[in-house]
Amino acid sequence: MKVLITGFDPFGGESINPALEAVKKLPNTISNAEIIKLEIPTVFKKSLDKIEENILAHKPDILISIGQAGGRFGITPERVAINIDDARIQDNEKNQPIDLKVFEDGENAYFTTLPIKAMVKEMQEAGIPSSVSNSAGTFVCNHVMYGVLYMINKKYPNIKGGFIHVPYIPSQVVNKPNMPSMSIEDISKGLELSVKAAVENNTDIKTAQGEIC
């Protein structure tokens, strides 16, 4: 089994992206699955082009993209991606799409095909803060999650795919009062446990991970 796991380069004025750094720290094998690590640009469309190049090159069974979500307290597997690009800031090539569809012929939304509740359970049992998220935003993270699930729906039905957001690391919040963070070691361990859950669970577990509002 092969797992392709991607991490974005730094964006938004940050000098580091914990998503990419945590991906780099992952072992090369998890639960007997080969781990293929890929850096992708925080750029609309180019990020998806690079992912598809690597789908064709490596033919992964599982594809997990990792992104930074500053302000979150834990590691948050995403439930759903929506068919909209609405960028509050420019990407790394100064693109700023507003109210545009990711793919014109795509569904309004796609749900992850990863066992996200099993992933959360693995992390929580290891003492790592984690919860299911119901919004991947409308920037490049959602763009990538939606695009990957679109490609799975249209062309690569045998791949399981989805997205995980991670918090800032401590060095990023030195001048951000009251902003939560998590050590890169805990983030990487959480991702390792998430991959383990994805490899070992063909279907998700049934446990309450919803929100009131």
UniProtKB/Swiss-Prot annotation:
Task: List the source organism.
Answer: Clostridium botulinum (strain Eklund 17B / Type B)
According to UniProt, the reaction catalysed is:
Release of an N-terminal pyroglutamyl group from a polypeptide, the second amino acid generally not being Pro
Instruction: Show the taxonomic lineage.
Output: Bacteria, Bacillati, Bacillota, Clostridia, Eubacteriales
What does the protein in this record do?
Removes 5-oxoproline from various penultimate amino acid residues except L-proline.
Complex formation: Homotetramer.
**EC numbers:** 3.4.19.3
Per the record, the similarity remark reads:
Belongs to the peptidase C15 family.
Task: Report the PROSITE patterns cross-referenced here.
Answer: PYRASE_CYS (PS01334), PYRASE_GLU (PS01333)
Which GO BP terms sit in this record?
A: proteolysis
Compartments reported by the entry: Cytoplasm
Gene coding for it: pcp
Q: Gene3D superfamilies in the record, alphabetically? A: Peptidase C15, pyroglutamyl peptidase I-like
Catalytic residues per the record?
Answer: E78, C141, H165
Q: Which UniProt key words apply to this protein?
A: Cytoplasm, Hydrolase, Protease, Thiol protease
The GO cellular component terms are:
cytosol
Q: Sorted alphabetically, which InterPro entries does this protein's record hold?
A: Peptidase_C15 (IPR000816), Peptidase_C15-like (IPR016125), Peptidase_C15-like_sf (IPR036440), PGP-I_bact-type (IPR029762), PGPEP1_Cys_AS (IPR033694), PGPEP1_Glu_AS (IPR033693)
**EC class:** hydrolase
Disulfide linkages recorded for this protein, renumbered to the chain, are none
> What GO annotations for molecular function exist for this entry?
pyroglutamyl-peptidase activity
Read off the CDD domains from this record.
Peptidase_C15
NCBIfam families referenced in this protein's UniProt entry, alphabetically? PRK13197.1 (NF009676), pyro_pdase (TIGR00504)
**Protein name according to UniProt:** Pyrrolidone-carboxylate peptidase
**PANTHER family, per the entry:** PROTEASE FAMILY C15 PYROGLUTAMYL-PEPTIDASE I-RELATED (PTHR23402), PYROGLUTAMYL-PEPTIDASE I (PTHR23402:SF1)
